[in-house]
């Protein structure tokens, strides 16, 4: 992965090429005059060269993000609420208590082994199984071809929304069972009305609750991705001991044609979620909202301090035209390191022994450069975005935020 400080330099260069008022959000006050000088010297040559360089920088950033090309999301693309909630929990924007009312539980175990979460909606035109038996059954096909070859899937879950049943005198005491199967053979190769399947997960649920149900479908998804076995989809079966066939399955949102209507179908349709790791960086670890510590130094004192320290640098994705496919965050505080490393180096400058020796030699021999002010600690950010295939991705990117600076 490209180091974080190189990424920040690329973003800064992109802003120089774009010009205009966008510098206010990305370049600190001390650098604006230099940017203006660069633009002035460039003159007429800037027009043609800037677009070519911008394409190169954009390609570098997209490669760092693991994308083959710049996403061009369609107007029909839907961001599942589940993925938005996962982002807010994982990034620390909201605590679990604030979002618990939605019924979402953070998937600690799957996320602990993954740095990428992807969501997939099913192909609607393949959902009906002809000639099914007495129970309500549907087949779903999920296209997982957008998962990169280098991403190893560790687990997968199928999320189904079910609504409270209030039909009949005994509905409060009623239960129904939801069975999830992997389809082992396509319908065309078997006797009509029968599918060759294997059971993946099952659950007995109560009628009088409206909520999302999560089922483990990892064995099927691992066969499709790791073992490269054919993907014939999943079958969902809903049964009830005391319910007629007419009403079976109507409380589980697995079809657009339900009596409840299709206005909110986009957010309530079945969702397949995969957890994977591309071998780069750490897994999705939840970040708690940091408490701000009181500032002990006045702004005037900070301006006088020219020693190595961290400075503010806000990266706004709208400045590079990426806000159409990056869902969250709209930008982030990247910070940068700048300042002197004077002799003698103070303890708070977080110096190495080599930097101390180099600074000592510089004090008597100016041909030896001073130690440099560089990032000594970097942290990750989480990004929620639409990829090239209109699939929603939550990914952890390492070395994106400067946490500490020092003389090295």
Curated annotation (Swiss-Prot):
Disordered: annotated span: 283-307
Positions of the propeptide removed during maturation: 20-292
GO biological process: ameloblast differentiation; anterior/posterior axis specification; aortic valve morphogenesis; blood vessel endothelial cell proliferation involved in sprouting angiogenesis; BMP signaling pathway; branching involved in prostate gland morphogenesis; branching involved in ureteric bud morphogenesis; bronchus development
Signal sequence coordinates: 1-19
Bridged cysteine pairs (disulfide): 308-373, 337-405, 341-407
Keyword annotations of the record: Chondrogenesis, Cleavage on pair of basic residues, Cytokine, Developmental protein, Differentiation, Disease variant, Disulfide bond, Extracellular matrix, Glycoprotein, Growth factor, Microphthalmia, Osteogenesis, Phosphoprotein, Secreted, Signal
GO cellular component, one term: endoplasmic reticulum lumen
InterPro entries, per database record: BMP4_TGF_beta-like (IPR047833), Cystine-knot_cytokine (IPR029034), TGF-b_C (IPR001839), TGF-b_propeptide (IPR001111), TGF-beta-rel (IPR015615), TGFb_CS (IPR017948)
Domain of life: Eukaryota
Chain positions found as Phosphoserine: 91
Tissue-level expression: Expressed in the lung and lower levels seen in the kidney. Present also in normal and neoplastic prostate tissues, and prostate cancer cell lines.
UniProt-listed SUPFAM superfamilies: Cystine-knot cytokines
Keyword RNA-binding: no
Primary localization class, coarse: secreted
Pfam families in the cross-refs: TGF_beta, TGFb_propeptide
Subcellular localization, as worded in the UniProt entry: Secreted, Extracellular space, Extracellular matrix
Subunit structure: Homodimer; disulfide-linked. Interacts with GREM2. Part of a complex consisting of TWSG1 and CHRD. Interacts with the serine proteases, HTRA1 and HTRA3; the interaction with either inhibits BMP4-mediated signaling. The HTRA protease activity is required for this inhibition. Interacts with SOSTDC1. Interacts with FBN1 (via N-terminal domain) and FBN2. Interacts with type I receptor BMPR1A. Interacts with type II receptor BMPR2. Interacts with FSTL1; this interaction inhibits the activation of the BMP4/Smad1/5/8 signaling pathway. Interacts with SCUBE3. Interacts with TGFBR3.
Role according to the record: Growth factor of the TGF-beta superfamily that plays essential roles in many developmental processes, including neurogenesis, vascular development, angiogenesis and osteogenesis. Acts in concert with PTHLH/PTHRP to stimulate ductal outgrowth during embryonic mammary development and to inhibit hair follicle induction. Initiates the canonical BMP signaling cascade by associating with type I receptor BMPR1A and type II receptor BMPR2. Once all three components are bound together in a complex at the cell surface, BMPR2 phosphorylates and activates BMPR1A.
Family: Belongs to the TGF-beta family.
Annotated protein name in UniProt: Bone morphogenetic protein 4
Species in which this protein is naturally found: Homo sapiens
């Amino acid at each position: 992965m490209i180091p974080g400080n190189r990424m920040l330099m690329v973003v800064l260069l992109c802003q120089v090429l774009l010009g205009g008022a966008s510098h206010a959000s990305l370049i600190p006050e001390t650098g604006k005059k230099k940017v203006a000088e660069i633009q002035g010297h460039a003159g007429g040559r800037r027009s043609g060269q800037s677009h070519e360089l911008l394409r190169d920088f954009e390609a570098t950033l997209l490669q760092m993000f693991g994308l083959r090309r710049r996403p061009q999301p369609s107007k029909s693309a839907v961001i599942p609420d589940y993925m938005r909630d996962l982002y807010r929990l994982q990034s620390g924007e909201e605590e679990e208590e604030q979002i618990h009312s939605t019924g979402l539980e953070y998937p600690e175990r799957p996320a602990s082994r993954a740095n990428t979460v992807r969501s997939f909606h099913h192909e609607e035109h393949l959902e009906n199984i002809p000639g099914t038996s007495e129970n309500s059954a549907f087949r779903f096909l999920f296209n997982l071809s957008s998962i990169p070859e280098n991403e190893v899937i560790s687990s997968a879950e199928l999320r189904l929304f079910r609504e409270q049943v209030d039909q009949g005198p005994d509905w409060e005491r009623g239960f129904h069972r939801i069975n999830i199967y992997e389809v082992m053979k396509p319908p065309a190769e078997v006797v009509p009305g029968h599918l060759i399947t294997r059971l993946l997960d099952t659950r007995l649920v109560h009628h009088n609750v409206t909520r999302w149900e999560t089922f483990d479908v990892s064995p099927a998804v691992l066969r499709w991705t790791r073992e490269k076995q054919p993907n014939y989809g999943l079958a969902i079966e809903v049964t009830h001991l005391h319910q007629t066939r007419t009403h079976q399955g109507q409380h589980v949102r697995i079809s657009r044609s339900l009596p409840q209507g299709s206005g909110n179908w986009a957010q309530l349709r079945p969702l397949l979620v995969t957890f994977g790791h591309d071998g780069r960086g750490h897994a999705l670890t939840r970040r708690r909202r940091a408490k701000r510590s009181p500032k002990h130094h006045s702004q005037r004192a900070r301006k006088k301090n020219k020693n190595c320290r961290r400075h503010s640098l806000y990266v706004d994705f709208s400045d590079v035209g990426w806000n159409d496919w990056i869902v969250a965050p709209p930008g982030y505080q990247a910070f940068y390191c700048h300042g002197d490393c004077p002799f003698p180096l103070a303890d708070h400058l977080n110096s190495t022994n080599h930097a101390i020796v180099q600074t000592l030699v510089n004090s008597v021999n100016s041909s030896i450069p001073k130690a440099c002010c560089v990032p000594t600690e970097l942290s990750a950010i989480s990004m929620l975005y639409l990829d090239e295939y209109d699939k929603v991705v939550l990914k952890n990117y390492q070395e994106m935020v400067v946490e500490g600076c020092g003389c090295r």
